[in-house]
C-alpha cells in the first residue's frame, strides 16, 4: 500500500499563502489550512452554529507528500527559503513536524477539511468531488482544493467575493492579479463579467487556475497567463481585483490606476491590519478614493474607485 507523509507548519496567519505556495513548489500534492478564524461567527447553510473556537494568531498549514519524497530535505529547503523572507514578513516562531500516513488516511485527512460552503448571498464553493444540487439563484464554483492555493473560504477571499458582488453588474472587463486558484475569475464570470484576464507570477498557479476554470462550464471568457502583477498589461478594465500580500499590492497601484476606466474599481484584499494605512495612502496618492472597507478579524479588504465625483465615497 502506498503511504503518504504529512508535513505540518505552524506560522502566523499572514504567512499562510506564502508557506502554502512554497510547499507546493517543494513537491506537495496538496495543502490544507487549519485556521481558528474560519470558525469564528460562522453559520452553515442549515443554520447549525459552529462551536466556539478561541481565535489564534497562528494557523497550521498541512502539506501532503508521497513516500518517495524525502521530507527532511523539504523541511530544510523550506527553512532556508523562509529565512530569506524574515525582513519582508513576520512569520512568528515556525514549528514544523512530519507524520507518516497510509493511503486511506491521506484521502480521509485531505477531504475532511472541505465541504460545500455558501460564501456570499449568491456564491457557493463546492469541492470538485462533491455532488451538490444548487438552490434557485445559487451560483456554484467548483474547485479542486487538492491543488492548493486556497479553497475560497479564507477571509480575504470571502471579502473579495463580496466586493465583486458589490461592483459587478454585467458586461465588465476584469483583471484578476495573483489569481492563485482562479476562484475570483470564476466568480467574476458567474456574476456577469464579459471578459476576465487572470495573471499570476507562479507557473504552478497558472496551471492550477486553468484546471479549476475547466471544472466549471461556460468559462471560455477567462484568459489565464503568467504575469508579474500588471507589468506590460495594456488591457483597460472596469474592475481590477488583487488578493495578495499588502507589501506586493502597493507595487501594482500605479499600473492599476493607468488601466482602470473612469468610474471603475480596484479591489485589494489580503491586507493585514498593520498594513492598512500604508495601502490606503498609496491608493489615494495615486488618485483612487476608498468606497468600501471590509474587515474580518485582522484582515482587510478595500474597494477603491477611480472617480472625479467623490460625493458618497468614504472620505470624499
Curated annotation (Swiss-Prot):
GO terms for molecular function: protein-lysine N-methyltransferase activity. Belongs to the methyltransferase superfamily. PrmA family. Signal peptide: none annotated. Methylates ribosomal protein L11. One of its GO terms (cellular component) is cytoplasm. InterPro entries: Ribosomal_L11_MeTrfase_PrmA, Ribosomal_PrmA_MeTrfase, SAM-dependent_MTases_sf. The keyword Transferase applies. PANTHER family: ELECTRON TRANSFER FLAVOPROTEIN BETA SUBUNIT LYSINE METHYLTRANSFERASE. S-adenosyl-L-methionine binds at residues 157, 178, 200, 243. Its main location: cytoplasm. Its EC number is 2.1.1.-. Keywords: Cytoplasm, Methyltransferase, S-adenosyl-L-methionine, Transferase. It comes from Streptococcus pneumoniae serotype 4 (strain ATCC BAA-334 / TIGR4). Gene3D superfamilies: Vaccinia Virus protein VP39. GO terms for biological process: methylation. This is Ribosomal protein L11 methyltransferase. It is found in: Cytoplasm.
